[in-house]
């Protein structure tokens, strides 16, 4: 019984000695806050970001609709469903995944 109690005490001592990953000290100052704001603003893209209504629509028509609804989208590759993709994020790209019949099978989103 004493062994379990000792383990619990050691666990709590270790847990209280670590800070959480998101914790920020007051001495970090406003510079850290400004950098975080700048980072967040870079992730925001302009215009419409997703088109759930285009699932089942012919791919070429879907491409025209996306170009019309968000002119900042200039890169719209058409890929066969299941194709490998890169994990980078670009505000000017929407990938269209279609099937062998030429219909959109996944929701187009800015990626």
UniProtKB/Swiss-Prot annotation:
Induction: By wounding. InterPro entries: Prot_inh_pot1, Prot_inh_pot1_sf. Residues 24-36 form a propeptide. PROSITE patterns: POTATO_INHIBITOR. Disulfide bonds: none annotated. Its main location: secreted. The record marks 87-88 as: Reactive bond. GO terms for biological process: response to wounding. It is found in: Secreted. GO terms for cellular component: extracellular region. It holds the Pfam family potato_inhibit. Keywords: Protease inhibitor, Secreted, Serine protease inhibitor, Signal. GO terms for molecular function: serine-type endopeptidase inhibitor activity. This is Wound-induced proteinase inhibitor 1.
């Amino acid at each position: 019984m004493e062994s379990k109690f000792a383990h619990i005490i050691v666990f709590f001592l270790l847990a209280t000695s670590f800070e959480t990953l998101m914790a920020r000290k007051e001495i970090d100052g406003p510079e850290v806050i400004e950098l975080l704001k700048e980072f967040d603003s870079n992730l925001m893209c302009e215009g419409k970001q997703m088109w759930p209504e285009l699932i089942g629509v012919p791919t070429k028509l879907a491409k025209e609709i996306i170009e019309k609804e968000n002119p900042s989208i200039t890169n719209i590759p058409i890929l066969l469903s299941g194709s490998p993709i890169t994990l980078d994020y670009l505000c000017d790209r929407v990938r269209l995944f279609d099937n062998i019949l030429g219909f959109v099978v996944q929701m187009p989103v800015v990626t």
